[in-house]
Structures are given as structure tokens and as C-alpha cells.
């Protein structure tokens, strides 16, 4: 089961599980699909929402106020929970996940997590996250992220290496270094970009897990040298940008997280 909406130009589909975006099709481009298809040979997801943790927890356990909690799944639990559709119009959908006994067994906070999708002008999709601390006395600790995958290449006459990421302004972002298990080392190193703005895609870029950047520009475009199709993502308010596909593979997608 999924919910859909259209503005006559784009068609979007979202499923209640994880409030996960399944599809963005461009009707003006013969229903061209932009979102990764979820082919299990590479990665079975499409665009999971990450809450209340990002990545793994060391040992799958953590302690809060003297109590130990176990959560071995990657990227929290929201991606695996069924959200409620609380608002739906022709061009907007809002999904809600509230804390319950099951969530409090692994995450001891009262919360509401809202994910809103909007179809806006000029072929623009808006995604808005709202995290509400329902408790009047307890401070709430959480992490929040977005993990959308996009098809690369977008056209049958192109290949993965025809694509590149282009940032909106020249900078030298810092690449956050990870251990082999995907944990932070605490170190970072400069990532030199072509002309200060461009990263050409190659499958071997991801042989050692994701490229995680801090201090990058807050707008990045996925483009092809053919100039046929692409997309632009704005991520104001987020500290880090992750770039990933399945490591040591020829996966035909890239995630901009």
C-alpha cells in the first residue's frame, strides 16, 4: 500500500512504512523515474528517513540515566515503523510516528516525528521534518537524517561515470573519516573538488563506505555530462552530507544523505 499525489507535472508515491518516498516521476519526460527502485541485488530501500539515530550504535547498546537499552538496527527504528497519514491534499502529505511502549523499550523518550512531502513550483519536491518532544520535563536526545537514493544513470544511453556532483559554491569540504565498521574516527581530511565544486562519480569512490562531508555548500546538483536530466538538492539546516552507494559494487544509484 502506498499514497500518491500529483500536480500534473510530477507524480510522487510514499508508503506508510517509514514514511518512505518510493517514487518521483516526471510526466513531462515520459514518466522518467528519479528515485532508486530498491533492487535487492544492490540496496532494497528507496529513501529511508533516519531517526532517532544515524548509523550504528557501538555494540548495539547504550546507557541513559543508568538504564541500558539495546538497538542493533542501523539508522534507528523509524524506517521500520508504520506511520499514520495525518494530512493529505492534492500536493501535500504529512505522516506521523508517535512513541509507544515498543519505541520506549529501545528509546526512552516521548515524541512525535512528522514527515511532510510537498509538490512545489518548478518541479520541486519539499521534505520537512518536525520532531516534537511530548514530555514537559525530559530533555530529548536524537539524531535526524534523510537517505534518498537516486537512479544513476537516468537514461539507457548513459553510464554511471557520466555523472558528477556539482556544489553551488567553491569550497574545500572536510571528509569525515570512518572506521571499517562505519564509526567515526574523530578525524577529517580535506576533499579537493574539481574546480572547487565538482566530484565526478566512480564506483570505486565507495569501496570504503560513504563519503561524509562537513563544511560543504548546502546545495548540490546531480548532473550528467550529456546534460539530459539531473536534480538539485538543498539541505539547509543539516550539518553533514553523505554520498553513498553499496560498497565494492557497480550499483546504478547514488544516495545524497
Give the residues covered by each predicted segment.
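Extended, loop-rich substrate-binding clefts of extracytoplasmic carbohydrate-active enzymes
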Residues: 65-67, 72-122
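Surface-exposed, gly/pro-biased binding rims or lids
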Residues: 101-105, 171-172, 252-257
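Buried hydrophobic-core signal for structured, non-transmembrane domains
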Residues: 14, 66, 127-131, 256
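Beta-strand-rich N-terminal accessory domains
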Residues: 1-64, 71-73, 215-237
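Hydrophobic residues positioned within well-ordered beta-strands of beta-sheet architectures
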Residues: 3, 12, 93-95, 113-115, ...
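Active-site pocket scaffolds in enzymes
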Residues: 229-257
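Acidic, contiguous internal or C-terminal segments within carbohydrate-active enzymes
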Residues: 99-154
Amino acid at each position: 500500500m502506498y499514497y500518491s499525489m500529483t500536480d500534473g507535472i510530477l507524480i510522487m508515491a510514499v508508503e506508510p512504512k517509514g514514511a518512505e518516498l518510493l517514487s518521483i516521476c516526471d510526466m513531462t519526460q515520459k514518466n522518467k523515474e528519479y528515485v532508486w527502485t530498491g533492487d535487492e541485488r544492490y540496496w532494497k530501500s528507496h529513501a529511508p528517513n533516519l531517526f532517532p539515530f544515524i548509523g550504528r550504535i557501538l555494540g548495539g547498546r547504550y546507557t541513559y540515566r543508568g538504564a541500558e537499552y539495546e538497538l542493533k538496527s542501523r539508522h534507528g527504528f523509524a524506517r521500520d515503523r508504520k506511520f499514520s497519514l495525518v494530512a493529505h491534499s492534492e500536493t501535500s502529505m504529512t505522516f506521523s510516528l508517535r512513541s509507544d511502549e515498543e519505541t520506549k523499550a529501545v528509546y526512552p523518550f516521548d515524541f512525535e516525528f512528522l514527515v511532510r512531502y510537498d509538490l512545489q513550483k518548478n518541479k520541486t519536491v519539499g521534505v520537512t521534518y518536525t520532531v516534537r518532544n511530548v514530555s514537559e520535563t525530559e530533555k530529548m536526545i536524537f539524531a535526524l537524517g534523510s537517505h534518498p537514493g537516486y537512479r544513476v544513470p537516468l537514461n539507457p544511453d548513459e553510464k554511471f561515470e557520466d555523472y558528477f556532483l556539482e556544489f553551488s559554491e567553491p569550497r574545500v569540504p572536510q571528509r569525515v573519516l570512518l572506521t571499517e565498521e562505519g564509526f567515526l574516527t574523530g578525524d577529517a581530511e580535506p576533499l579537493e573538488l574539481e574546480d572547487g565544486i565538482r566530484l565526478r562519480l566512480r564506483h570505486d569512490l565507495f569501496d570504503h563506505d560513504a563519503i561524509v562531508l562537513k563544511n560543504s555548500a548546502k546545495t548540490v546538483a546531480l548532473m550528467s555530462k550529456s546534460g539530459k536530466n539531473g536534480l538539485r538538492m538543498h539541505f539547509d539546516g543539516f550539518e553533514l552530507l553523505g554520498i553513498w552507494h553499496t560498497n565494492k559494487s557497480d550499483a546504478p544509484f547514488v544516495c545524497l544523505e
